[in-house]
Amino acid sequence: ECRYLFGGCKTTADCCKHLGCRTDLYYCAWDGTF
């Protein structure tokens, strides 16, 4: 189960495709890919 945009995360692996974990704020943000 992946985390959606603004979902809590520890690493990018926690986030859905095209999202990366912001480790300063610990949420999934768009990584700029389509």
From Swiss-Prot:
GO CC terms: extracellular region
Location of this chain's protein in the cell: Secreted
SUPFAM superfamilies per UniProt: omega toxin-like (SSF57059)
Signal peptide: none
Alphabetical list of InterPro entries matching this protein: Huwentoxin-1 (IPR011696)
Predominant location: secreted
Record key words, sorted: Amidation, Disulfide bond, Ion channel impairing toxin, Knottin, Neurotoxin, Pharmaceutical, Secreted, Toxin, Voltage-gated sodium channel impairing toxin
GO molecular function ontology, one term from the record: sodium channel regulator activity
Pfam families membership: Toxin_12
Annotated domain remarks: The presence of a 'disulfide through disulfide knot' structurally defines this protein as a knottin.
Function field: Gating-modifier toxin that potently and selectively acts on Nav1.1/SCN1A and Nav1.3/SCN3A. It enhances hNav1.1/SCN1A currents and delays fast inactivation of the channel (EC(50)=11.6 nM), leading to a sustained current. Similar effects are observed at Nav1.3/SCN3A (EC(50)=11.8 nM), but with less sustained currents. When tested on Nav1.2/SCN2A, the native toxin decreases the peak current by 50% at saturating concentration, whereas the recombinant toxin only shows a weak decrease of peak current.
The protein's name in its UniProt record: Delta-theraphotoxin-Hm1b
Organism of derivation: Heteroscodra maculata (Togo starburst tarantula)
Taxonomic placement: Eukaryota, Metazoa, Ecdysozoa, Arthropoda, Chelicerata
